[in-house]
Every structure is written in structure tokens, then in C-alpha cells.
């Protein structure tokens, strides 16, 4: 499977970090959150980070070109409808994850892989919220502080 578009559910520290590195790697990214203020703060943080990386010579591409690959949205259907890969980075709350995975399963293409970033909840339980448990994986990211 060729991954071109990534949907990130949750624009907090982990989610916006995943969106940033995905865009740097050249993917189209849809960053979704349920809170407009958190979403806009995430975009501001990503922009700041990209500019710093560029200033330090760690990012050769124009930060605005990278940022243009990140599409912020409150709408889960918009975020996942063209996604090849979805990464959920929301609170460690099974009800929150149930809502995300149920909705993502409804709107994501049949070939899409759905990933959870959980560190404490059973992945098999999360997979059970979908009609495609075989396409649900666990993926733990690391949020660097420097």
C-alpha cells in the first residue's frame, strides 16, 4: 500500500508533533481536533517549530511549503475520507477512542490503516469499535522535549 495522506486525530502535543513530522516527510496531513482553539494553537506551534528547524539548518524546505501540507479541521469525515493511514492521539479515555474509531471507520476508505497511540488501553478493544479490526494497529510515538 502506498501511503500519501495521513489523518491525525487530536491536535495536542503528541498529535501536532505527529502531524509536523509527517508533513516534513512529504505526506499530506489532515489534523483534526474537536476544539478550534486547540487546533489553531497546534498550527501556530507547528509553524514556530518549522521556522526554528529551518533557521538551524535542520529543515531545507521552506517552512510555509511544509505547513501547506497540513490541513486543520474539526470535521472527522473531512479528515479521514482520503486518508491511507489514520493516527489517533487523543486522551487515554476509552469512550473518546470509541467515538473516534467508530466515526473514522465510517468515513475512511476501506484500505486505510487505523492506528491508536494508546499506551495503556487494550488495542484489541479499540479495534473492536470498527468493522475492520484486522486494520487497527497500536503505534506509540515519542514527544521530544528538545
Give a label for each model feature.
Residues 1-49, 56, 107:
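NAD(P)+-binding Rossmann beta1-loop-alpha1 motif at the extreme N-terminus of oxidoreductases
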Residues 9, 32, 73, 89, ...:
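Structural motif
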Residues 26, 67-69, 111, 133-136:
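A generic structural signal for alpha->beta connector loops
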Residues 37-41, 52-114, 120-122:
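Rossmann-like NAD(P)-binding element
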Residues 113-146:
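Rossmann-fold dinucleotide-binding core
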Amino acid at each position: 500500500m502506498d501511503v500519501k495522506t495521513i489523518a491525525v486525530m487530536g491536535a495536542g502535543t503528541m498529535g501536532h508533533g505527529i502531524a509536523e513530522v509527517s508533513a516534513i516527510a512529504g505526506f499530506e496531513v489532515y489534523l483534526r481536533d474537536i476544539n478550534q482553539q486547540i487546533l489553531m494553537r497546534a498550527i501556530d506551534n507547528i509553524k514556530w517549530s518549522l521556522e526554528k528547524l529551518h533557521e538551524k539548518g535542520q529543515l531545507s524546505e521552506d517552512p510555509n511549503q511544509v505547513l501547506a501540507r497540513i490541513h486543520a479541521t474539526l470535521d472527522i469525515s473531512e479528515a479521514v475520507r482520503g486518508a491511507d493511514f489514520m493516527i489517533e492521539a487523543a486522551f487515554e479515555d476509552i469512550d473518546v477512542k470509541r467515538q473516534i474509531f467508530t466515526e473514522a471507520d465510517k468515513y475512511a476508505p476501506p484500505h486505510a490503516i487505523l492506528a491508536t497511540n494508546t499506551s495503556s488501553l487494550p488495542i484489541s478493544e479499540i479495534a473492536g469499535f470498527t468493522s475492520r479490526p484486522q486494520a487497527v494497529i497500536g503505534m506509540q510515538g515519542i514527544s521530544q522535549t528538545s
